[in-house]
């Protein structure tokens, strides 16, 4: 298939960005979206850099920078806004799991980086997602002694609680929730992490401290507030539900009442 790509190009976080249009031809419907971008970059490298165009600010003319790692829907690095949707038109998949069969010959595809205050652009389609790491560092862990493996196996956990905890732990931290939210809120990410630990006996000990610390860090890093539009749930590639946000709100309120 032949496609027209409108790709966001931006030198760095402070530079003014713009769209550039490219043509790619003979793309297999079995190719992944990232493989299609690889083909585009091979094409741009073969064409070489036009110093005059770069000097005039008309064309970046170099390969398009985009982030990726595992290409298996695990790491969350391949974070792109495709035709106005986080990770593209398919449901419950990451960008690297999106295949070109979801598009038609002659389509125009608009590709942008994440759009959230907490994710500044590094270059082109690459954004800085360190904010999520900082939120995790604020409390997304268990620091109390939990014993060895035999001790963990000896603690009975109801199956329902274990399943809910694993649902939250499925979060890959891709940032689709914050990028999709009209307020740029990271509540679904924080809620998934808080919920996955608060449901377990080992994580319950620090539940109050964790909820307060992670919410405070989220606010400090410039993420917005949740207004219950549920766009985050719709675009999450792991289909993490807003029930975790409800649990985070309960944990946070109880923690504040204990102060």
For the regions a protein language model found, what residue spans apply to each?
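Short proline/glycine- and polar residue-rich coil/turn motifs
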Residues: 27-28, 102
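Well-ordered beta-strand positions in beta-sheet-rich domains
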Residues: 19-24, 93-95, 182
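Short, structured protein-protein interaction patches enriched in aromatics and acidic/basic residues
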Residues: 55-77
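Functionalized membrane-embedded alpha-helices
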Residues: 74, 80-82, 232
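S4-like RNA-binding module at protein N-termini
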Residues: 84-103
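Ferredoxin-type iron-sulfur electron-transfer modules in oxidoreductases and energy-metabolism complexes
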Residues: 31-59, 109-259
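Eukaryote-biased recognition of intrinsically disordered, low-complexity regulatory segments
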Residues: 1-26
